[in-house]
A protein has these predicted regions:
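Alpha-helical structural segments
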Residues: 3, 10-33, 48, 52-56, ...
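Residue-level recognition of oxygen-bearing side chains
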Residues: 7-10, 66
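Solvent-exposed, amphipathic alpha-helical segments
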Residues: 22-33, 67, 121, 125-129
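Short, flexible, glycine-rich and Lys/Arg-enriched loop motifs at helix boundaries
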Residues: 25-50, 98-106
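Residue-level recognition of alpha-helical structural elements
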Residues: 43-46, 50, 76, 80, ...
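Amphipathic alpha-helical packing segments from all-alpha helical-bundle domains
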Residues: 56-63, 76-103, 113-120
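C-terminal peripheral helix-coil segments that are non-catalytic and often amphipathic
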Residues: 63, 93-100, 116-165
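Short, hydrophobic secondary-structure boundary micro-motifs
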Residues: 69-71
Length: 165
């Protein structure tokens, strides 16, 4: 196998790049769809854009679980070393940007760093499910449920009523 590649790094990227590229294409499309929502609907409409795409995300990742395992467990020293954190950061930025642009008076922004920590937990959970031996339907169902818990929780944290203000 090494005869086809000049280095282990070249082999690593030959295995992992297709999965990452396919995933990022879907995530970029989702973000564009979210950005296209009217400002007034964006915070509460993000889930309506995201949830129908969970099966596509799961399909991309389970199509090559070995590549995903390499990204999660063997990416130290590669361009994918912080890949999960990068995705979490993108999600946190999208949420923070949405909240900053919202005109609703009952919502107050929470620190982007806090949202990023929450997103890191969510993304780590997604990837743990992918590298587990769970079947596609179980992963999709878990991701939908966990996503709704995170969505509801983040919105609750932003609501002034929740904070007693």
């Amino acid at each position: 196998l090494y005869g086809y590649f000049n280095s282990k790094e070249e082999l690593f990227y030959a295995i992992t790049d297709p999965v990452v590229n396919n995933l990022m294409e879907v995530l970029d499309r989702i973000r564009s769809e979210m950005d296209a929502l009217p400002k007034k609907e964006r915070l509460y409409g993000m889930g309506k854009v995201y949830y129908p795409n969970i099966p596509k995300i799961v399909d991309i990742l389970i199509a090559d679980r070995d590549a995903v395992k390499l990204i999660v467990n063997g990416a130290k020293g590669t361009k994918y070393e912080n890949f999960l954190d990068t995705i979490a950061g993108r999600n946190a930025l999208t949420i923070s940007k949405t909240v900053k642009n919202i005109e609703e008076k009952t919502i107050r922004p929470i620190k982007e760093q806090t949202i990023e920590v929450l997103m890191e937990g969510y993304i780590a959970t997604l990837f743990r499910l992918i590298i587990s031996d769970k079947d596609r339907e179980t992963i999709i169902r878990c991701m939908e449920m966990i996503g709704k818990i995170y969505e509801t929780g983040i919105i609750a944290l932003m609501q002034k009523v929740f904070m007693g203000e």
